[in-house]
Regions:
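Conserved Rossmann-fold NAD(P)-dependent oxidoreductase catalytic core, especially the SDR/UDP-sugar
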Residues: 105-165
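Alpha-helical substrate-binding/gating segment
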Residues: 184, 195-201, 213-235
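Conserved C-terminal active-site "lid" loop/helix of NAD(P)H-dependent oxidoreductases
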Residues: 235-261, 276
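N-terminal Rossmann NAD(P)H-binding glycine-rich loop of SDR-like oxidoreductase domains
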Residues: 22-38
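NAD(P)H-binding glycine-rich loop region in Rossmannoid oxidoreductase-like domains
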Residues: 63-98
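Conserved beta-loop-beta element that borders a ligand/cofactor-binding pocket
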Residues: 166, 176-201
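Rossmann-fold cofactor-recognition segment
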Residues: 55-64
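Glycine-rich NAD(P)-binding loop of the Rossmann-fold in SDR/ketoreductase-type enzymes
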Residues: 64, 94-102, 170-171, 214
Length: 276
């Protein structure tokens, strides 16, 4: 995965360069569309989602359909797993069926197909429960009481205990932990991205977006860095948030290990014009 193009040699000795084949689950969503739009010159994408996707080979099926996933995973170098329940973060039945059941089906199909790497799209919701406890500086940031992390309050990162704020976050923690299992047991490289708030408008839409806002370009760059990360990364978790002054999750791990360089910032917008 460290090289962007795979070198193939024919029986005649001719050498050609081919783009890595990447299956995108949940390809019809916002992140999938951005990745396909911006990275198709670099990767050979195929899609998998319940809604059709134009412009790339596509399988229209439910993420829990493991037989369809098995067929779609054949011949793939990597899987970018975006599919999840996003309509109702606290609908446990749908989280169980889509976010948990679908993620397990994806890992199983990828492992059986010999996929070398899964980039699993996790979420900041795995940590946003830290905003809830009394006197939380993180909650105060989300409520517009501070314009930056107060002195003495630490930045949190992937090494801190998870504290989900919803069943959605619980489901994503299942995906992270299952990824670690498949990495340890089967040798698959699994990289998890704890995504910040990526919005269709590409700007914060409420005050609580300001700590965790992630510009679309920064999100796409993170996906690219994870798909192309060194083969030596067998399992890891990276926080993805733009350069927001109210940020309370530390993104230095991705900057140092992957060379990720976010350029967006919620500071370009005025929280006074938005609802809490």
């Amino acid at each position: 995965m460290l090289i962007e193009y795979l070198i193939c040699q024919s029986a005649r000795g001719d050498v050609t360069l081919t783009r890595p084949k990447v299956l995108i689950t949940g390809a019809s969503g916002l992140i999938g569309g951005l990745v396909i739009r911006d990275l198709s010159q670099k990767y050979d994408f195929s899609g998998f989602s319940r809604r059709p996707v134009a412009g790339i080979p596509h399988t229209q099926a439910d993420i829990s359909d493991i037989d369809a996933l098995r067929r779609a995973s054949k011949g793939m170098d990597m899987v970018l797993h975006l599919a999840a329940e996003t309509q109702d973060y606290d609908d446990w039945d749908r989280v169980m069926d889509i976010t948990i059941g679908g993620t397990l089906a994806m890992y199983r199909a990828a492992q059986e197909a010999g996929v070398k790497r899964v980039v699993f799209m996790s979420t900041g919701s795995t940590m946003c429960g830290y905003e809830w406890f009394e006197g939380s500086p993180y909650g105060a940031l989300a409520a517009n009481e501070y314009d930056r992390l107060p002195p003495g309050a630490k930045m949190l990162d992937y090494r801190d205990p998870p504290r989900p704020d919803s069943f959605y976050g619980v489901g994503k923690l299942f995906g992270e932990n299952t990824g670690r299992l498949f990495s340890d047991k089967y040798g698959m490289s699994v990289i998890c991205i704890r995504l910040g708030a990526v919005l269709a408008s590409d700007k914060p839409e409420m005050v609580r977006h300001f700590p965790g806002y992630l510009a679309q370009a920064d999100a796409v760059q993170m996906v690219d860095k994870c798909l192309g990360a060194p083969d030596s990364i067998r399992f890891d978790i990276f926080d993805a948030i733009s350069e927001n002054s109210r940020r309370w999750r530390d993104t230095s791990h991705a900057k140092e290990l992957l060379g990720w360089k976010p350029t967006g910032s919620a500071d370009n917008y005025d929280p006074k014009t938005l609802a809490v």
